[in-house]
Every structure is written in structure tokens, then in C-alpha cells.
Regions:
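Short, basic/aromatic recognition patches
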Residues: 1-7, 131
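Short, structured interface segments
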Residues: 115-132
Length: 282
């Protein structure tokens, strides 16, 4: 449920159980706001179950945090409420957590079980885990093609998608932090790259414009939302546009992925044409 709203934080859900009955549920809803464990505990308290905590088990998809960030440590909150046992789906690879939450709970005398449904929990947060373990964003390549395997025409827009598939693509966009196209797609399609057909936040718009030849009138440069332009001419920021300078003597894909890591962008949807898609595959 937190997809598209909590990045760069992971999506996390928590359930509090007392004698086989759920007494509280919660999930991380918005970046910078209360984590899943907090919402779960607050719901249980609101429902009058605070006295049951010392005999309760919390099930949480990711290791509770142990550091002060946008919010206080969830491990401290669990300890404060004397919850008896915590069952964790997967360990948090973020360097400020990475086992510290588990250690803190255990030192407080709380029983901790890890690795329950770990595969499913890793899949849930594949963007987060890719970013922190492989040190690059999670990349999704998207294209539409005709029955005879064509994805476009030279310098002209080819309409393949229908109303249903367009809404599906906008749903996908709402789940990723950034969306990337190349110069040819920007000129031929003049896309907005928003989520106007689906609820949720629009991703950061990325475009490769090596010579800075794209006209400012293109929809991708609309003032609503952030834009990053990868180019060989300049570095800097103008209004809502970040210009990120790259070179032509090394892989543009690697430079883009390194830049996105620098910007703390954990996922990118590549919606470009054949040239851009092939560069990622190669």
C-alpha cells in the first residue's frame, strides 16, 4: 500500500497478535511520517489493548530501525511497550540499521525470530534492497510492441497502447521514483511522463539530451515536478531542472545509474525507444 509514497524508505507492514488474535495493524504510509510499527502499536492502544503487549507477538516485514532519522527508532518503541516477541521477515541492509535493530531488541530481552517469509519480503522491497546491496537503482524497461514486433517508426509517433494499457503504465509510473526517456522519444512523442491517469505521485522526469537540443516548449520540461537532463554541455540547476554532465567516452548507462544513486533515486522506469532500451540490455 505504500508503493510510490514512502521511497526512499522501504515499504513495511506490521501486525500485533495476542493469543492468536490480531490486536493492531499498521504500515508505513508516507515518507517522513510514522513507520509501520508505530502505526500498529498506536492502533492497538486506541483499541484498548495496551495491557496485552507483554504477552503479544509483533510480525513485521523488515527489521525495526535502531537510529534517529525522520522519526525515532522503532526498536526503542517496541522495547518501551514491552512487546514479548518480534518476528521479522528480512534484515534491513541500510548501514544505519543492518542488524542493529535486532541486536537492540535481543539485548532488551525480547525474543527475535528472523527470516520468516524472507523471499516474499525481499521481493516486496526489491527496489530498496537493490539500491543498498548493489549500489544502484532498480531498473525496469518498458515498451509496447505491435503483433509483428515493431515498437516504433523513425521520427514519427506510433500509437500502439490502448486506454487500458495507458492506465496500467501510469500505475507503474506511480510506483517508481523516476522515469527515463531519450532525445528521440522526447521529440517524436512529446510525452508528459506523469501519472494523470492514475492516483499517486508523478515520478522525477529524466531525459538524455547530450547536445541540449531539445526545445524548452516540450511537455517534459513543464514546471510541475523535478527534471534531470543528462548532457555533455553543462552542470547545474535552473528552476526545476537539474543539468547533469556526462561524458561520451564511458557508458552513458553506468553514468546515469551512478548519478541516480547520488540523487538517492532507488528505482527508474525506462520508457525510451529501441536505442535507450538496448543500451540497458547491453
Amino acid at each position: 500500500q505504500g508503493a510510490g509514497y514512502v521511497a526512499p524508505n522501504p515499504m513495511v507492514g506490521a501486525v500485533l497478535v495476542h493469543q492468536g488474535k490480531i490486536i493492531g495493524e499498521g504500515y508505513h504510509q508516507v515518507y517522513g511520517k510514522a513507520h509501520a510499527e508505530v502505526n500498529c502499536i498506536e492502533q492497538a492502544i486506541a483499541n484498548g489493548h495496551a495491557g496485552k503487549f507483554p504477552e503479544s507477538v509483533m510480525y513485521v516485514t523488515l527489521e525495526p530501525c535502531a537510529h534517529f532519522g525522520k522519526t525515532p527508532p522503532c526498536a526503542d518503541l517496541i522495547i518501551h511497550h514491552r512487546i514479548a516477541e518480534v518476528v521479522i521477515g528480512s534484515r534491513d541492509p541500510f548501514k544505519q540499521v543492518d542488524g542493529k535493530g535486532i541486536e537492540k531488541l535481543q539485548k532488551a530481552g525480547i525474543k527475535v525470530i528472523t527470516g520468516v517469509l524472507e523471499k516474499e519480503c525481499l521481493e516486496l522491497n526489491k527496489r530498496f534492497f537493490t539500491f543498498h546491496t548493489l549500489h544502484r537503482p532498480y531498473v525496469i524497461l518498458k515498451w509496447a510492441q505491435t503483433a509483428d514486433a515493431r515498437i516504433g517508426t523513425i521520427n514519427r509517433r506510433l500509437l500502439i497502447s490502448n486506454e487500458y494499457s495507458n492506465r496500467l503504465v501510469h500505475k507503474w509510473r506511480s510506483e517508481e521514483q523516476a522515469i527515463l526517456i531519450g532525445t528521440n522519444t522526447a521529440l517524436a512523442d512529446n510525452p508528459e511522463l506523469t501519472t494523470r491517469l492514475w492516483p499517486g505521485q508523478s515520478p522525477i522526469r529524466l531525459v538524455i539530451d547530450m547536445e541540449l537540443k531539445l526545445p524548452a516548449s516540450l511537455k517534459i520540461f513543464a514546471p510541475e515536478g523535478r527534471v534531470i537532463v543528462f548532457n555533455t554541455r553543462k552542470q547545474g540547476k535552473e528552476n526545476n531542472i537539474d543539468y547533469y554532465q556526462v561524458t561520451e567516452d564511458t557508458s552513458i548507462v553506468h553514468q546515469i545509474l551512478n548519478a541516480l544513486r547520488h540523487f538517492n533515486i532507488q528505482s527508474v522506469l525506462a520508457e525510451g525507444g529501441a536505442q535507450l532500451l538496448q543500451s540497458f540490455i547491453d
